[in-house]
Amino acid sequence: MNVYDDVIDPTVVSHSVCGHFTTTDYLELIVIRTDVLSIYKPIRSGRLYLMEEHKLSGRINDVALIPKHSNGSNGNGINLSYLLLSTGVAKLSLLMYNNMTSSIETISLHFYEDKFESATMLDLARNSQLRIEPNGNYAMLFNNDVLAILPFYTGINEDEDEDYINNDKSKINDNSKKSLFKRKKGKTQNNKVTHPSIIINCSELGPQIKNIKDIQFLCGFTKSTIGVLYQPQLAWCGNSQLVPLPTNYAIISLDMKFSIDATTFDKAIISEISQLPSDWHTIAPTLSGSLILGVNEIAFLDNTGVLQSILTLNSYSDKVLPKVRVIDKSSHEVFFNTGSKFALIPSNENERSVENILLFDENGCIFNVDLKSEGRLLTQFNITKLPLGEDVLSQKSNPSSVSIIWADGRLDTYTIFIGFQSGDATMLKLNHLHSAIEVEEPTFMKDYVNKQASAAYNNEDDDDDDDDFNLYSDEENDQVNNKNDRTFGTNESNEPFTAQELMELRNIGPINSMCVGKVSSIEDNVKGLPNPNKQEISIVCTSGYGDGSHLNAILASVQPRVEKALKFISITKIWNLHIKGKDKFLITTDSTQSQSNIYEIDNNFSQHKQGRLRRDATTIHIATIGDNKRIVQVTTNHLYLYDLTFRRFSTIKFDYEVVHVSVMDPYVLITLSRGDIKVFELENRNKKKFVKVPLPEILTEMVITSGLILKSNMCNEFLSGIGKSTIEQLLFTFVTADNQIIFFTKDHNDRIFQLNGIDQLQDSLYISTYQLPDEIIPDPSIKQIMINKLGNNSKDEYLTILTFGGEIYQYKKSRSRHSRFYRNVGRNDHPITGAPDNAYPKGVSGIERIMHYIPNFDGYSVIFVTGNTPYIIMKEDDSLPRIFPFGNIPIVSMSRWGEGSVICIDDIKNARIYSLNQDNIYYGNKLPIRKIKIGSMLQNYKTLNSIVYHERTQLYLVSYTKEISYEAKAEDGSLLIGYKPELPNAKAFKSGVLLINPKSWEVIDELDLPDNSLVNDMKSSFIQIDTRTKRKREYIIVGIGYATMEDVPPTGEFHIYDITEVVPEPGKPNTNFKLKEIFKEDIRGIVSVVNGISGRFLISQSQKIMVRDVQQDNSVIPVAFLDVPVFVTSLKTFGNLIVIGDAMQGIQFVGFDAEPYRMITLGSSITKFEVISVEFLVNNGDIYFLVTDRDSIMHVLKYAPDQPNTLSGQRLVHCSSFNLHSLNNCTMLLPKNDEFPRDQRYSRSFQTITAQVDGSISKIVPVKEETYRRLYFIQQQIIDKEPQLAGLNPRMERQDNKYYHLGHSLRPMLDFNIIKRFKDMSMNRRSHIVQKLGKNSNLEVWRDLIDLEFSLRSLKPTDQN
């Protein structure tokens, strides 16, 4: 009984596409990160502004835009497009954006998996490949040797079936005689989007077509035509001598025919070419033909199927190539592996014969392939590496997606978006591209006409016209080294080529390893006061590989910069008066003693004793007004007006206590405890008194809880003379006791407006004229509202609601209609901060929660929320608004300070001036992420692997791996016969260990290992060093493997290190620790994993697990061992228990006993998982195991010796299997925070953290039986009753795998991403669900949600909330 939740959303961009999906006003960039769909607005200046974001319930495999064939353009000749998503094994979802509801609607769903399985005997691949016809008329989904074609409706054509046309006409005639509803239905049927799909086995395309490597729709044909790259007989390097050229290529025309019930097709093979190299893997269509990408070569075939030329790319190019023109470009030494990305640059309208294709290799280098043709004759074929510069894309590798955003052929500039598996996604601008292209002599290919090409690659019965295809040299294999006949020049511009990175989207994937340790709480005191992030623990992980590898710290809360610290004796609230361009006075009040004080900021905060400020009363609010020439003070019963020297001008007394004040020059809005309001305007001429503003008469019938003065254009369409104007108007805004929000202007004429749906927290809200209900039932839940703009460079307007229970809700103003607000239920994943019905009184007791809007907090417009756990609401340009805990100490009151800072008061009357820490910290994910680069340009450690935190010294140890050139040596060290050092060699590894001080993140000590070494694992463990006293010391254990070649057996070794304190280097106080080697031992076989257990340590060496003991003289002796089946990939310990994950044989559960020394196998899994990582799951004294395998499936197994059919626990019980959307790399056990502590009889709670290659981090939290039942019911209700984005079934996406039948169908792992949608439902919908759970279930459900939400507060041990 476990619950899965995301801690960090995926960050690796897997797919992207440009087009018009939500608007035609500007081009949109749609970005996919595993299961997150983001829609950005690109700006020419180089920014990406997030406009929409949605989270799906399944992994998105591919994305495409399908143009709408309708008259729905917005006057600029551009139509919106449908969005086509490929998910699962073989599923397509067609989506449309609804501007009225600001939501995505599902038009149609297409499931092909069952049809694919019945149409082929091969096992289906996990993901199908999506291809789109150039005109957007067809979508193709293929998996191995079976494909599905989905035709899109483009209107009835003349060549369609006559029956189909007549059938539609008869339907229209029949519908004209029926009701209006049915007439509309008939009209909808005529405007349908898709025709029936057709499933095709590859053998239907041609008798030899099988083992498909790639399929693409081709350009330049009147009918839909595909190119198929396939191998009639599977080949690999082992049988290359028998089948040297095993690959074929076919061009096939498809003639689709439609009927109501089915789609059929006729095929015509235009051309078929055989005997192509085995490493050719990808088809890149161009306007005049196709590029065939291979690992070692690139070939060009025209649209008639003639192979015209081949470029060799490296020294390993196939020596047996087809008999065509071969151009030697092997000096590039580049390899385009399967999955290499390419992008076709749009051609100039005046130069259709010139084409440029950008190719991206795995190292982040960009190559340009330029094609020039005259008719069908290829006259230019060349490849050039673009000189990007040292800093451009230097820390990025393995491109995962490429989209061209803008292409300006006139200026020869191109803006492209590139997503990387390792490194931040980048918007890259290429200026004067043609200046970097190597220009061949324009007639270099005209003299080469291969008269044998037609006979070799065309059928014998071809027409005589095929002789025109013989284009190249008489030589069978004319190798031409064109290094001497190429020139570096400019084609269209005299300006030099430059590349510029405009903006990056933060990526922390792939995550290699992680640990927990101190980052923001290294210093105990800051500026003489306790660190605001005191005792916080962060998740620190190693990310990326190669030059882009770095550390990432996942912070538990925002870590502010402390600029200054102050101490007060008596204070509960604070204000800062900004006068004449600077901070002049600091005003404090103490509500417990009913007194106020004023301090001069310029005079070292000395008390200001002049003037008539009311000091013997509690100040509710104080601010400047009247163009900063007057000061207004509101106490519990009075309003005072002063000049800048606190000379009093006027006083207004109130009969009831003031509870809330809002000031916006020249107005003051006051809410009284009786429930009525007062609005005053500063007299404009002399500014010495307030004038009362007349209020609408209907307000006398209402009970007001709070008020706000704001400026917005949301009521403009209801105001006469304004209409569609976007000019913001001043609005007096109120919250009533029946949870309505009302507005009126100064010139209201007794007309007020309301925000409909806010009382029930509906998904969408709209403004209308207010009408007094027949009965008002006071039941206030909304405490405070704000309507303001949030963001950094791009600011959007949001409605933010704070309830009396501490909940925070947020709505965004509609882009299409300013009088509407909407909430993105599918993506509104704000953390739970409170609960209704007093379900979480701890969150709001003691310190009042109040929202404070800060328009400039180091450039960000943010909202602070005071309380025991303070929060900050902020928004990055490329993300949604996020809610983060702000530090780890309470905040009682706060105010603006200077330019971009705030001053905050904690619960012990200390004041700190904060600014935002922007030192490589990203605030656009669920938690703040700090990027930490290790090393420098002079010392590049390449890939960072394992990371360990040393608790005693508070230092980090990181292993690194560098790629070195491989040397094929025998056991005696001599080079093997046949080794060619002049050719590019394979890569070997060289590893080491770094000791890092987190105060400066500098490497203070380093351990270098020999060549061909690899640090497989590293752990910090407390090892017993004295058997008599049982004294333990924290040691570092490092497991190493050495591998050279397949004929030499691998070896390994393990090292034990201590960290000792030394005298620091001069001027470097942080270098006061060094690594000290305690023990080292060589091992036969590699050491794959290490860990500590019961004061000893164990290692996996070859096919054994060996437990060793450290003696007093620092020697090490083995004390116990265990044989393992194949290879240990993961091993974890808990007390004296061990769980071992094998690469092929599942897991083993083992116990270790020290008296006598022995290892006892307690149980093992029946299923043979290919284990990647394993971890303990401890729940209420029961032992569970979390296993992740190579199929990205997470399994939960249980040790249950009391259950039948387990052979006293020898068979581990398979509880559930849960599909991950990405491959897991590592897991870690952490203590769980119990927000509602249970009885002391229960053992301590734990949770497991997992990290994936897509940059996501998740947690698996065990729960009690009663909690599981409540949450399971809520999840079922949401899945069954609520609409799912893209029509994906969350239950199917998570549980549909080959292990489903092994688990308990009624005890699956729950998905908290689904359950948490409960908090974003409307209040009546929530009530409807919890009523089915029984009495008082609402209270229990909210406590369950809060306990799961706050489980990671174990990283904040002193949190008082």
UniProtKB/Swiss-Prot annotation:
One of its GO terms (biological process) is termination of RNA polymerase II transcription. Residues 459-478 have a biased composition (Acidic residues). Keywords: mRNA processing, Nucleus, RNA-binding. Residues 479-493 have a biased composition (Polar residues). Its main location: nucleus. GO terms for molecular function: RNA binding. Disulfide bonds: none annotated. It is found in: Nucleus. Residues 455-493 are annotated as: Disordered. GO terms for cellular component: mRNA cleavage and polyadenylation specificity factor complex. RNA-binding component of the cleavage and polyadenylation factor (CPF) complex, which plays a key role in polyadenylation-dependent pre-mRNA 3'-end formation and cooperates with cleavage factors including the CFIA complex and NAB4/CFIB. Involved in poly(A) site recognition. May be involved in coupling transcription termination and mRNA 3'-end formation. Belongs to the CFT1 family. This is Protein CFT1. It comes from Candida glabrata (strain ATCC 2001 / BCRC 20586 / JCM 3761 / NBRC 0622 / NRRL Y-65 / CBS 138).
